[in-house]
Amino acid sequence: MKITKITTYRLPPRWMFLKIETDEGVVGWGEPVIEGRARTVEAAVHELGDYLIGQDPSRINDLWQVMYRAGFYRGGPILMSAIAGIDQALWDIKGKVLNAPVWQLMGGLVRDKIKAYSWVGGDRPADVIGGIKTLREIGFDTFKLNGCEELGLIDNSRAVDAAVNTVAQIREAFGNQIEFGLDFHGRVSAPMAKVLIKELEPYRPLFIEEPVLAEQAEYYPKLAAQTHIPLAAGERMFSRFDFKRVLEAGGISILQPDLSHAGGITECYKIAGMAEAYDVTLAPHCPLGPIALAACLHIDFVSYNAVLQEQSMGIHYNKGAELLDFVKNKEDFSMVGGFFKPLTKPGLGVEIDEAKVIEFSKNAPDWRNPLWRHEDNSVAEW
């Protein structure tokens, strides 16, 4: 079997799908994208495609190493996202050829279900509470919320109080009927993270995500030493080599590699194993589309330390398309009691509505994240 063609489709709301075709008619799908940089990743995919055309898709490990090592410069969000989507599609092909789901090819199930959680947008308490109520109606009881709006490098007590007030109102509205993590989104400087984490402790969040940017990872063990709240990070780390340094330094309790950013299934399975050796749990980052989610689920079901799975159903970014709009077998992604079950169809287990993908790709938006500024007009972290 040989790879004959690679096609990319930029899609709303901010996704990109990839299709790999073979000379035997077997097709694999992947989802390579960096939100806001889809065209750049697309170019990287087709650069890698120059080598991949004519290669045997079953040699996933060798193809991965070539894509990563054959270029003198390596790593980073663009290349690793391109590799990720290609890797997902190669696993999809392998599973279809062998008539088995990917998790079966990786040793079989380690669990029968995985807890799902949903991102809830909004910075005003009433908006967040309303969003939680809506999502509870479709079965969610675990959520992730903004931990704050933009904060200055050293900000005032009013800004801290505003962030804490939102969380306090949510806990008061729902008590312990729900669990929620708080996403600082890298918006918070190390000095302010120290203050804000302390103030939020009484509301017992499930975790605090990206308390500081990955570039400031040396602060993770320092922040962890001052709180009992688990710290989570990983969406802006792109290979096992990035995660190695964080695991060795300590401080992170929940690793969040993104299956569409961190080298795909092949690399993230290695990252999961590394985390397990350090007694660190896994909760793959996934505010993206259905192929990315499927890839995450296969890792969840073969990784002992996987504890939570993010997904984008109902997320406020989803303008123009919802999570399962391009999927034919929607029922396979249904949840029971807030849990996903294993996908059982061969490969990734996603049946893509290709005609709809082609149609929607004709007018795909170029999504960009907002540009925020502080009161003094300096750029703020979003």
UniProtKB/Swiss-Prot annotation:
Pathway(s) of this molecule: Carbohydrate acid metabolism; D-galactonate degradation; D-glyceraldehyde 3-phosphate and pyruvate from D-galactonate: step 1/3
Active site: H185, H285
Binding site for Mg(2+): D183, E209, E235
Catalyzed chemical reaction(s): D-galactonate = 2-dehydro-3-deoxy-D-galactonate + H2O
GO BP annotation list: amino acid catabolic process; D-galactonate catabolic process
Feature type site, description Increases basicity of active site His: D258
GO molecular function list: galactonate dehydratase activity; magnesium ion binding
InterPro entries associated with the record: DgoD-like, Enolase-like_C_sf, Enolase-like_N, Enolase_C-like, Galactonate_deHydtase, Mandel_Rmase/mucon_lact_enz_CS, Mandelate_racemase_C, Mandelate_racemase_N_dom
Note accompanying the cofactor annotation: Binds 1 Mg(2+) ion per subunit.
Pfam family name, one: MR_MLE_N
Entry keywords, A to Z: Lyase, Magnesium, Metal-binding
Cofactor entry: Mg(2+)
Highest taxon in the source lineage: Bacteria
EC number per UniProt: 4.2.1.6
Residues with site note (Transition state stabilizer): E310
Record PANTHER family: D-GALACTONATE DEHYDRATASE, D-GALACTONATE DEHYDRATASE-RELATED
Family stated for the protein in its record: Belongs to the mandelate racemase/muconate lactonizing enzyme family. GalD subfamily.
Note: Reaction proceeds via an anti dehydration.
Function: Catalyzes the dehydration of D-galactonate to 2-keto-3-deoxy-D-galactonate.
Protein name as catalogued: D-galactonate dehydratase
